[in-house]
Amino acid sequence: MLSGKLVRLIEVHQQEITDRLLRDIHRYPDLTHLRQLPEAELRERSQNLLENLGYWLVDGNEEEMARKYETLGKSRFDDGVPLHESVHALFLIKEKMIDFVGEQGFPPDVLELYAEEELERRVGRFFDLLVLRLVRGYEGAWRKVAYATA
């Protein structure tokens, strides 16, 4: 796995990436509900994801994080955070992570380019799973409320 060095780079610099994420959450006007959540909670979620990225990307381990994000979807519904804001936050984490790697100025050789491409593909699949499970949890909580009031 050529992207292992890049995954480790993300894990080591998770605090810097998280700081960038939190700045963006406060900058985007359409994330009003999300930015009202405690910053400590947002920071902890991001750092847990980033500092253990290598573990989460191993086959079989991603399901553990997916379950956590299904529970997070339910929590976000209960907190009144719109679904689009919750999904947007995941997109921002992925974007900040990939941007950080691209900014490191590695010499552009074929192996390094391949490693970055491999990382983007692996991270993309992982985040797709997280989004899917977040939405599933959110919809499950929404259905429960809808059926209770029907």
Regions found by a protein language model. Give the residues of each.
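Long, amphipathic alpha-helical coupling/dimerization segments that relay conformational signals between
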Residues: 2, 6, 65-150
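N-terminal low-complexity or simple alpha-helical regulatory segments
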Residues: 2-84
